[in-house]
UniProtKB/Swiss-Prot annotation:
This is 6,7-dimethyl-8-ribityllumazine synthase. It comes from the Bacteria. It comes from Enterobacter sp. (strain 638). (2S)-2-hydroxy-3-oxobutyl phosphate binds at residues 86-87, 128. 5-amino-6-(D-ribitylamino)uracil binds at residues 22, 57-59, 81-83, 114.
């Protein structure tokens, strides 16, 4: 039996982060967590990290796809926050972002890490952006790095 596992340290990784401006008071913390994890744990060099801001979570798949198609990046990290309101808007935005990002990963064959919070309240979002429930931006960054190494091991 063969088992493939990989570490997260990826010093030569080239990583793009696409991040939504909408709810930026939460997303800024996700970005800080992602960049900290990339540099501190993944040992990624500052010059190998690109950050692209988009209006909202719904635009993340388009930006992620454009970044992936350049061939310049080993992974893309998508960060954003969608908070449920009183209308069906939440389902459309959260579903569109999730499905779109999964499609980009499958088409581009590079990791596209999902760091989009989909919460019932602002309080839940704040908890997941660096307080009680950790930082989902950092978790997405570590997922991206591990998947870079997993794919390398599969192809080796």
């Amino acid at each position: 039996m063969n088992i493939i596992e990989a570490a997260v340290a990826t010093p030569d990784a080239r990583v793009a982060i696409t991040i939504a401006r909408f709810n930026n008071f939460i997303n800024d913390s996700l970005l800080d967590g992602a960049i900290d994890a990339l540099k501190r744990i993944g040992q990624v060099k500052d010059e190998n990290i690109t950050v692209v801001w988009v209006p909202g979570a719904y635009e993340l798949p388009l930006a992620a796809g454009a970044l992936a198609k350049t061939g310049k990046y080993d992974a893309v990290i998508a960060l954003g926050t969608v908070i449920r309101g009183g209308t069906a808007h939440f389902e459309y935005v959260a579903g569109g972002a999730s499905n779109g990002l999964a499609h980009v990963a499958q088409e581009a064959e590079i990791p596209v890490a999902f760091g989009v919070l989909t919460t019932e309240s602002i309080e839940q979002a704040i908890e997941r952006a660096g307080t009680k429930a950790g930082n989902k931006g950092a978790e997405a960054a570590l997922t991206a790095l591990e998947m870079i190494n997993v794919l390398k091991a599969i192809k080796a």
